[in-house]
């Protein structure tokens, strides 16, 4: 789908909070979250499919490209349609390296759900546990993508039964993290289960993936995937079970919209009085209430200056609005409001509660 068509449609849909998903991607380093994101961008028409997985489109800082890791939080708004209904998925690609867990925590404040990416060969690692624990502490709901299934077949030479056995162990270990760190009222519902569509399997590098329900719709079995690699026909999987469909459908169907999420997240992440006008507006994700934005990051643009990224929890933000920065204890005039499209920003007139925005004019 071409970029500009998507941008215009996304702007219209931003007002429909029930059709918004604010989600992040978290993982142990090198488990493939940025490669997965590149595949999603390729489908959106923002990246050539030929270089998806190699371009590192959200790693737009020179240091990130050079070191091959994601350091600062990057953002993209994607359009995904299910049964004729379009949804906006505001996607954040977060750091996976142990040195940058503070940036992960800030990013988690802005989102309501996460796709946790786990390497099928390496399985759940220390940093997987660290970032999953952080997400659960912020009341951010997880779903699971088990990546690099191709390595189980191509490198380890596992058969269909052996592949499934290894994947079930990853799911078990991941659910153990939810049991260990999840809050009592959420952990049972948030445990991932392939039968419920909260687990996807695939290869981000080869751009295919599926959930159980998607595989049933397409008539695909694990043995078909194994055979595709054994006969070197894995490219066919990109067409039959494209990765973007599995990931975005899993996100839309299982992760909460801002109205649902803020009811239980605001009491955890906001220390103000919930019965106040601001508190009630945040709990309801009310775009007509007082404007409250949680700023999660800032980076320097050589042309525009400092760009602040934030999630609007209530109210709305327009160019020319004056906002008070609690940390700086000072008013600032918003010079520009935009939405993210990878390394680029699309200027918009207004961004309402429940959405992620980029703001110019704030001196953080």
Residue ranges and their predicted role:
Residues 1-364:
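Structural and coupling elements of P-loop NTPases
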């Amino acid at each position: 789908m071409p970029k500009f068509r998507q941008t215009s449609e996304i702007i219209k849909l931003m007002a429909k909070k029930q059709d918004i998903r604010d989600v992040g991607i978290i993982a142990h380093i090198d488990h493939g979250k940025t490669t997965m994101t590149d595949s999603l961008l390729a489908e959106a028409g923002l990246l050539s499919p030929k270089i998806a997985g190699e371009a590192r489109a959200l790693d737009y800082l020179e240091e990130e490209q050079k070191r091959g890791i994601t350091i600062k939080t990057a953002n993209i708004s994607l359009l995904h349609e299910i049964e004729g209904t379009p949804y906006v998925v505001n996607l954040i690609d977060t750091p996976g390296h142990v040195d940058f867990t503070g940036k992960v925590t800030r990013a988690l404040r802005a989102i309501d759900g996460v796709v946790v990416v786990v390497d099928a060969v390496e399985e759940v690692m220390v940093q997987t546990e660290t970032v999953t624990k952080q997400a659960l502490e912020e009341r951010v709901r997880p779903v699971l993508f088990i990546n690099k299934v191709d390595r189980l077949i191509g490198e380890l030479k596992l058969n269909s039964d052996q592949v499934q056995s290894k994947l079930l162990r990853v799911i078990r270990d991941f659910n153990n993290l939810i049991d260990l760190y999840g809050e009592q009222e959420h952990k049972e519902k948030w445990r991932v289960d392939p039968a419920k569509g909260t687990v996807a399997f695939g290869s981000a590098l080869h751009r295919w993936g599926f959930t159980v329900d998607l595989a049933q719709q397409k008539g695909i079995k694990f043995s078909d995937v194994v055979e595709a690699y054994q006969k070197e026909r894995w490219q066919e999987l990109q067409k039959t079970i494209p990765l973007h469909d599995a990931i975005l459908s899993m996100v839309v169907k299982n992760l909460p919209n801002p109205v649902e999420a803020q009811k239980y997240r605001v009491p955890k992440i906001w220390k103000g009085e919930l019965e106040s006008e601001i508190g009630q507006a945040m709990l309801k994700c009310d775009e007509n209430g007082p404007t409250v934005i949680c700023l999660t990051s800032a980076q320097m643009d050589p042309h525009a200056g400092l760009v602040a990224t934030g999630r609007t929890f209530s109210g709305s933000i327009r160019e020319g609005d004056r906002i008070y920065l609690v940390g700086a204890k000072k008013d600032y005039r918003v010079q520009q409001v935009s939405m993210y499209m990878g390394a680029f920003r699309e200027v918009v007139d207004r961004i309402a509660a429940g959405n992620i925005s980029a703001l110019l004019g704030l001196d953080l």
